[in-house]
Amino acid sequence: MKKILLLATGGTIASRPTAAGGLAPAITSEELLACVPELADLCAIDAVQLFNLDSTNVGPAQWQEIVRSIRENYAAYDGFVIAHGTDTMAYTAAALSYMIQNSAKPVVLTGSQKSIYNRDTDARNNLYRAFVYAVSEGAWGVQLVFDNKVILGTRARKTRTRSFDAFSSIDYPETAVFRDTRLIPFLRRPADLPPVQFYEQLDPAVFVLRLVPGMRADIIPLLAPHYRALVLESFGVGGLPGGEQGEMFAELRRWCDSGRLAVFTTQVPHEGCDLAVYEVGRAVGELPGVLEAHDMTPEAVAVKLMWALGQTQNRAEVMRLFETPVEVDII
């Protein structure tokens, strides 16, 4: 029988109503397991309550805590299941994909849209299936299990705020799906995985700027004292209003000339960006320090930058790390 470690972090799955009328995490890891007694027939389980937070409050410090716990327990367990809130689960899944690379053991995130104590909750289904995937043959790496889907950590996005079908795999096949109680794998553990690598250093000095028509360019210098990298969510396949002659281009050139980075992505959910297509993007793509996110998810773009910036102060090396595919984040 395989041995799995449950890491409980809070979220809706672990929430109870408060006196003020809202929901807040309060249910423990032991209580979660008690709600799914059939897990005892599936595998041996230990549980750790890392923290109990609404996932809106989960960020780099909590990602580091999760990684430390997995690294310290990696040799003792066959896999890991993380109970997590849904709102930032895709960020955590992407972050763990960069901070725990080449893992032959599964690191599975799951949660729910309703508390595990809610009568019509999706929590028990999701938690049980997360463990089913974790003990399955061929399971590996950072995955997100939700509503009968298994999604690679770098490809997961929350696409619905209320429905049980809350997460989608963006521009990449699902790792596996469940049909009733049967797990149907589409992707299996690569045969030539290098040894697992753990990283803990992150630099969160990344700002994401969503362009809107009419936006003033003077916002960019206001960010310079506080951030090393700027992610620009641009229109379509990418570009700047006014192109090479615009005020935004001039400010971005000053940003890059100061040694900072800028990464272009798109506001469109699918198919990525390509600055070479239109004149409003071609000159931008030639600026030193400008990168393209290609088909990466917005969550992966932001946290990969945090990870790369945490490894080095050298801009060229940060650019190399960002452009190197990790866990199929770039196709």
Question: In which residue ranges do the predicted regions lie?
Answer:
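Accessory alpha-helical/coil subdomains and C-terminal extensions
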Residues: 2, 7-11, 28-29, 34-39, ...
